[in-house]
């Protein structure tokens, strides 16, 4: 089984203490790519420690950036902040176009795909340590290299 965790973010970002308030502009976030995710996607940790538990991440990507079919161990909630995105659900075949304020929730192990239809930013919230498991067309787990090397 191939599992990508967000542990690498601990080296890039300083997690906020739970008892501290914070307010910052989008331009003050420190975005960075993460191994195991498409190079087009960059992340900034807003709260929590995604390698250890519940967290909120701000994801940013250019038009056409695709995070291919995958699932997570935690429940994931996504809210688009800017631009437009498409969220596709494998089990229902549902594809939803979301603009600012658009919301999607994927329960644990729910296979989905996320695409920035235009340059987009979205909050990604998870209720436990964040991971990503890529799947092939039949739903079998595949290594990130295989998922990310496919032409979109």
Locate the predicted segments by residue.
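Sec-dependent signal peptide recognition
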Residues: 1-8
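Hydrophobic h-region of N-terminal signal peptides that target proteins for export
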Residues: 9-17
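A short, N-terminal "cap"/entry segment at the start of jelly-roll beta-barrel domains
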Residues: 16-55, 137-152
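Conserved hydrophobic/aromatic beta-strand scaffold that supports enzyme active sites
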Residues: 43-45, 56-58, 77, 95-97, ...
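Short acidic-glycine-tyrosine-enriched beta hairpin
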Residues: 49-51, 62, 85, 90-109
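Short, conserved beta-strand element in jelly-roll/cupin
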Residues: 59-62, 71-87
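Short beta-strand His + acidic residue motifs that chelate non-heme Fe in jelly-roll/DSBH
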Residues: 67-69, 87-88, 106, 111-117
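Ligand-binding loop in jelly-roll beta-barrel domains
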Residues: 99, 108-132
